[in-house]
Amino acid sequence: MIGIIGKKLGMTQLFNDAGQQIPCTVIEAEPNTVLAVTSTEKLKALQLGTGAQRTRRANAKGEKTPKGNRAHSAQLGHARKAGLDAAPRTIRSVRLDEPGNAKAEIPTHAVGDKIDVTIFAPGETVKVTGTTKGRGFQGVVKRWGFGGGPNTHGNTKHRRPGSIGPGTDPSRVIKGKKMPGHYGAERHTQIGLRVEKVDAERNLVYVRGAVPGPTNGIVVVRKQG
């Protein structure tokens, strides 16, 4: 299940040979560097890195420095083992073996290898993992799709959840009850997406359908099956 770290650029549309319109998500995936290789009996995985992070340095008195985290010496040392001059901005781990499928072919990679979009081909099925859009504190109508109360005959509880459980027995709210709360900003994996096009020159992958996350959000695209 080799994969690659990418950035969601947005959505567009493609047309197949029959003239049908296909909605697609465009994912930009610059070549990833293999930072570490895990190979045990129970786990075979790669640690991938992409982008570049600013390094720490001594600041002159009164000098204004840009905001954001800077890579420390441990991160730089880890990156130099893979032949990089700067620490990667984004690091993710990708599992190579498939649990429950011992016959699956496991690709071999070494520290410092590059992985680009050519690992995918049109027609393949992939799964995309990302962080959904954060929507803050929301009520049950938006968060869980409740129907709400009546809109007429003097009702004033249009978007309230209603009863949240029995009274005397058990005298508590059952765990897992759908109630208002924080909505979004969660890790989500969308499976069964088809690769429609691969543009190796521009490091782009066109995937049919929508993927989780906002524009410019970090995603991980992995082969499925």
Q: Where do the PLM segments sit?
A:
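Extended basic (Lys/Arg/His-rich) segments that typically form rRNA-contacting surfaces
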Residues: 1-225
